[in-house]
Amino acid sequence: MNRLFLFFSLLIGNTAVSQSVILTFTHEVNHQPMRANKAYYTAQGDTFTITKFKYYLSNFSFISETEENIRLSPEYFLVSEDSAASKKVVLTGLPLGRYKAVSFMIGVDSIMNCTGAQSGALDPIYGMFWTWNSGYIMAKLEGTSPASRVPDHSLQFHIGGYRGAHQSQRMVRLNAPFVVAAEKTAVINLVADAATWFNGATPIRFSETSGFMTPGTIGDRIADNYSHMFSVKSK
């Protein structure tokens, strides 16, 4: 009897109750693949290129079919166009079951943002921490545009930091039905379209705004714009 009990105890103990989930990210501009120095157009008709595109993701949670919100342990990921490895985010510890949505923050939460420079993905070596202005850059887009009035026609949008009411983290929720099973790792493929930075509720004209690198109203509005840049990639 004791041996039988031990057998089933070991069997239950070895049964997985959680599994990993992989998020992959593809970058586009106006539904076209993002390519360095390729010319794109805003909805306002401005031509522009992108030379740098990166953003922080954190505070992941998943919503089950019964509307239970499963929050994962805090992790911070820096996704960058020039790093293929960064476009694959592996999240662990998600309980087995059926889910209908994923939620995450674009940026770094207030606790880490106000603690100062960190290590790992938050290491200042990645150029996403303002040493002269407390806080992290939540998202960065750089490039060029003939419409830019600065001498080299550059575009520099560094959105982040804290100053009074100006906080640029944005929460995203995407409907993405999937199943977490013990025998298989779920994969969710996401697309980030950089055109939304300039084509959202607040249209950006490069002749008027060719960059922004401090907390403020313009940064808030661009963050509102790019909070809509993510979608689930259709199969």
Please state what every model-predicted region is.
Residues M1-L23:
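Bacterial Sec-dependent N-terminal signal peptides
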Residues Q19-K235:
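A short, solvent-exposed, low-complexity linear motif enriched for acidic/polar residues
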